[in-house]
């Protein structure tokens, strides 16, 4: 089997000559043993990789992580209580045995000297279950395993990759200019482009709602659409194509302009309210730990835990408290409305006694005060923990774990080679994504498009990356 390069293929230029082994047969062998026999060498070892220490360990770790994922996703039988309890007990035994072997293999790999490139290989090497399946990497499962998530070596490796990108192959004595040129686009730079585009969009949207177009009494179609409006529409489209988790404001902006074509949203239109809602959501998203965000630009280990703390302790707490008190609060408000009004639901009612009105007013105010007190109590509970070795855990272990997950997922998301950040991704969507999706249906090879993607990136995106890298060389 030969691995065809894709957009997810890493820039690590050290691929072995021999094809990498498949995982399918090894996973089937693990199903036939008990948890006590899981650590047998012949089950987890791949002789084909015996002379490649990093890939050998990567294969074994990925095999166990995939097997762990398979076991934990298995649904239990609900027919019999004893059967369900037995299955849960067996699952705990399996997970414990798998985790012990994962830690054993990882610590055994670290017990001997290994370079930064070795760590990259073990985390980012792609293996497939079968010849046509999607590739899997150890890094894809790090956030799902508690020991690997809190491992200091993995943390340092991902922080280094975030700032500098994947290392070049030190065994290759001939380093050409193009690999170094490609390496300029680190995950940090890629994210900075994303965040910069979002900030530019936010500024233009603020200018629009502060100074909307003022059409003349008689104007031609599309006359009020200027460069500002065109840029807002283009960035909205590119953000949606980019699949940002926080692309709702961009979709609202695009919808506002579409429904008003050939004119533009005006303060008297409902579409203008969509722009205001989009602006409010964008401002709120600046405080969320989801990329792109300002917390990933400088010292994520200090800023991301604070963002996660605020989201979990404040927004999460408010949502829980409101959900808890909402039924009684709604009833109190409804009863208060009935008591204060002589007409309710088109039914004439006699005025309620003053004592009744006072009671429902007291109930509504009391529920609101209880909600505020509950929020304050829950927010202040376990907000700060004792001093810890890692800055990620200075608020609490749970907050540190959640912050690491957000950071690691961001590193994975922005580690794609030859990326096309917005608005360049519109060009990528038209010239690369659509053909690679359509042509396989006609049995036409798409391998040419990976080379096209590289060349387009080097010509169009690369110069902007080089300039950005020059001005931010010492920042991250």
Write out the residue ranges for each language-model feature.
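Soluble extramembrane domains flanking the early transmembrane region of eukaryotic membrane proteins
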Residues: 1-179, 459-471
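Extended, intrinsically disordered cytoplasmic tails
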Residues: 1-2, 6, 10, 18, ...
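Terminal single-pass membrane anchor helices
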Residues: 182-192, 196, 208-224, 243-246, ...
């Amino acid at each position: 089997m030969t691995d065809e390069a894709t957009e997810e293929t890493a820039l690590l230029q050290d691929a072995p000559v021999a094809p990498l082994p498949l995982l399918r047969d090894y996973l089937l062998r693990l199903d036939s043993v008990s948890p006590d026999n899981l650590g047998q060498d012949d089950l987890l070892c791949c002789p084909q990789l015996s002379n490649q220490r990093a890939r050998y360990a990567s294969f074994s770790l990925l095999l166990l992580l995939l097997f762990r994922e398979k076991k934990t996703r298995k649904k239990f039988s609900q027919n019999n209580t004893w059967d369900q309890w037995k299955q849960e007990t067996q699952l705990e035994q399996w997970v414990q045995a798998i985790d012990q072997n994962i830690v054993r293999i990882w610590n055994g790999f670290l017990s001997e000297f290994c370079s930064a490139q070795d760590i990259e290989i073990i985390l980012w090497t792609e293996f497939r279950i079968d010849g046509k399946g999607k590739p899997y990497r150890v890094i894809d499962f790090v956030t799902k395993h508690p020991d690997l998530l809190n491992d200091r070596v993995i943390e340092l490796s991902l922080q280094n990759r975030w700032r500098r990108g994947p290392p070049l192959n030190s065994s290759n004595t001939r380093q050409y200019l193009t690999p170094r040129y490609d390496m300029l686009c680190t995950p940090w730079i890629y994210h900075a482009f994303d965040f910069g585009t979002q900030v530019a969009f936010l500024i233009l949207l603020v200018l629009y709602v502060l100074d909307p177009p003022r059409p003349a009494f008689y104007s031609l179609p599309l006359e009020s659409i200027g460069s500002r409006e065109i840029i807002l529409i283009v960035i909205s489209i590119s953000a949606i194509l980019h699949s940002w988790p926080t692309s709702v404001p961009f979709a609202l902006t695009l919808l506002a302009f579409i429904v008003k074509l050939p004119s533009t949203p005006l303060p008297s239109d409902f579409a203008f309210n969509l722009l205001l809602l989009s602006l409010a959501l964008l401002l709120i998203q600046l405080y969320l730990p989801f990329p792109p965000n300002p917390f990933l630009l400088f010292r994520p280990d200090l800023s991301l835990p604070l963002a996660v703390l605020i989201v979990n302790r404040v927004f999460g707490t408010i949502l829980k408290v409101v959900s808890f008190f909402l039924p009684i609060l709604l009833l109190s408000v409804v009863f208060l409305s009935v008591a204060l009004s002589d007409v309710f639901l088109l039914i004439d009612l006699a005025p309620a006694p003053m004592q009744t009105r006072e009671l429902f007013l007291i109930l509504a105010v009391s529920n609101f005060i209880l909600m505020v007190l509950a929020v304050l109590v829950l927010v202040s509970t376990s907000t700060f923990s004792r001093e810890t070795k890692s800055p990620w855990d200075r608020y609490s272990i749970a907050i540190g774990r959640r912050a690491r997950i957000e950071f690691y997922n961001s590193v994975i998301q922005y580690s794609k080679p030859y990326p096309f950040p917005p608005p360049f991704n519109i060009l990528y969507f038209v010239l690369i994504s659509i053909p690679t999706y359509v042509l396989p249906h006609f049995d036409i090879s798409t391998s040419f498009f990976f080379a096209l993607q590289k060349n387009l990136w080097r010509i169009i995106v690369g110069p902007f990356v080089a300039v950005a890298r020059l001005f931010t060389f010492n920042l991250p």
